[in-house]
Amino acid sequence: MDVEWNGLDTLVVAAGVSALQPLLAIAGVEVENKTELEMTTQEGIQNTVDVAAAATRGNYVGPLVAAVTFVPLLSNTSKSPSILLVNSLASVIPAPTRTLYASTKAASLVLYQALSIEHPNIAFTFFMPATVEGDFRASAVDSGPVRELDPNAHGLKREDVAKRCIDATDNGEKAVFMPVHMRFGHLLYWVWPAFVERAARRKYNFGV
């Protein structure tokens, strides 16, 4: 690749898969507005394991393979190497119905954060947008329904997200939230978690 591409300056890691159901719903147990839960079955547990494996492959193993493949090339061929990880706000602010999605995206975020310490010669940017317009949810590994407001009507515009990604990478920004005020939402979770959890339930129309 270093011969064919003449090296690499910037790596963008943006691939991923969605998951849209509460964790126990994947196992076949309805949890919303229930005071007593059914017991999970062997089939339901196995389905959860299979769905979790698919989410992990897309959201964690994929970025891991990208890092192992391209970090040496970046380090050896670029005078100013950089990596942009397009992650999700759900990786730092927990969301109902996004249990598997959020946890696997959080895993890849911490992976790259640790990697940035191991490779200080590479400029890392961790991009965490809120809901973005488009059909990304069609990739859901659990075939769950979209509960929040129509992403194409209320989500961030793809062109705006792409421009912000480019600017953040060019400027060497580390942790980038979009919209920017969501940075305070992340901090607020540690100060007033009940408020953030109520807002998350409203956004995802869960138990409200």
Segments from the language model and where they lie:
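Active-site helix of classical SDR
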Residues: A67, T104
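Active-site loop-to-helix junction immediately N-terminal to the catalytic Tyr of the SDR YXXXK motif
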Residues: P94-A102, A114
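Conserved mid-core segment of classical short-chain dehydrogenase/reductases
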Residues: V17-A53, T97
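SDR active-site lid
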Residues: V110, S116-V180
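A short helix-coil junction within the Rossmann-fold of NAD(P)-dependent oxidoreductases
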Residues: E4-W5, Q21-P22, T69-K79
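Alpha-helical segment proximal to the catalytic Tyr-Lys
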Residues: P72-N76, Q113, I117-E118
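Residue(s) in the substrate-gating loop at a strand-loop-helix junction
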Residues: S88
